[in-house]
């Protein structure tokens, strides 16, 4: 592995406005992986923005989805494996057709989300990991590289963790190194069972007006002072012996302007706190190798 650390972000993407706050191409140019959190609309503007990031910046663009509601977790439909296979195959087909770089599974069974049986979830992942992720079939790799398969929120099946490239930990409101240590492998808040620390990315949240991310997150204790928690996560990624993969943000566009509001002044740079976190992890001028094994896909106009 190189010393490069990953910056990941979810984005509620809306191409209906010219504002760079809601345009995909307005994100920081050193951001490694961005995922459509609110779905993807296959239109010309979206295709152009995705292709721009892939070809001009090397950013990997994913789709975030969660197990569909029509797969029951209780009752008669809870073991409908055939339907799960069809759903997974259709999802993969869409990712390839749209020219995206992979898939992010949003799964939070202990936090109000649906909890599928082990067999149901393994059936889903067996299909997805045939085409995506480190275990994908050789025929679906391009120049030895594969599309990404990541999971965020919670993963309890340690035996299947090796099907994923990364576990995205929702380490919201982290206030210290110890709070992040707790979320590492075998910690008491280890929500990514089976994932080594070097495959974990910790994220801060920016999902609503008025939360602390307009100032980079909550106060984080670092080197006898307080800094924004996103910067604390960045320092943790490069300085902690846990050697996690990086850091990131949930709903990035709310961190575009100071105070999480569209009409407030933008700090010295748009996405100021995100850009500084990237700089902490990967200082400008540092030469690194690409670790995000996604393939480039030609997109039709």
Question: What does each of the following model-derived ranges do?
Answer:
Residues 1-301:
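Secreted glycan hydrolases and related glycan-binding modules that recognize and/or cleave
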């Amino acid at each position: 592995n190189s010393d490069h650390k990953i910056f990941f972000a979810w984005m509620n993407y809306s191409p209906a406005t010219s504002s760079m706050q809601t345009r995909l191409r307005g994100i920081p140019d050193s951001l490694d992986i961005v995922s459509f959190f609110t779905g993807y609309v296959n239109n010309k503007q979206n295709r152009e923005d995705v292709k721009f990031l892939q070809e001009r910046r090397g950013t990997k663009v994913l789709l975030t989805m969660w197990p569909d509601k029509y797969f029951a977790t209780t009752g008669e439909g809870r073991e409908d494996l055939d339907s799960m296979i069809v759903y997974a195959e259709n999802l993969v087909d869409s990712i390839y057709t749209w020219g995206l770089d992979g898939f992010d599974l949003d799964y939070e069974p202990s936090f109000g989300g649906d909890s599928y049986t082990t067999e149901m979830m393994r059936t889903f992942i067996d299909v997805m990991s045939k085409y995506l992720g480190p275990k994908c079939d050789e025929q679906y790799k391009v120049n030895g590289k594969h599309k990404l398969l990541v999971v965020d929120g919670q993963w309890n099946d340690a035996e299947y963790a090796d099907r994923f490239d990364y576990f995205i930990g929702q380490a919201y409101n982290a206030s210290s190194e110890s709070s992040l240590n707790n979320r590492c492998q075998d910690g008491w808040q280890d929500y990514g069972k089976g994932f080594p620390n070097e495959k974990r990315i910790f994220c801060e949240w920016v999902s609503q007006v008025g939360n602390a991310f307009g100032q980079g997150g909550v106060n984080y204790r670092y080197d006898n002072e307080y800094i924004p928690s996103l910067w604390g996560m960045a320092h943790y990624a490069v300085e902690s012996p846990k050697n996690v993969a990086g850091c990131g943000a949930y709903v990035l566009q709310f961190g575009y302007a100071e105070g999480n509001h569209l009409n407030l002044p933008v700090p010295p740079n748009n996405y100021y706190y995100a850009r500084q976190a990237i700089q902490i992890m990967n200082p400008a001028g540092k030469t690194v190798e690409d670790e995000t094994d996604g393939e480039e896909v030609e997109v039709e106009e």
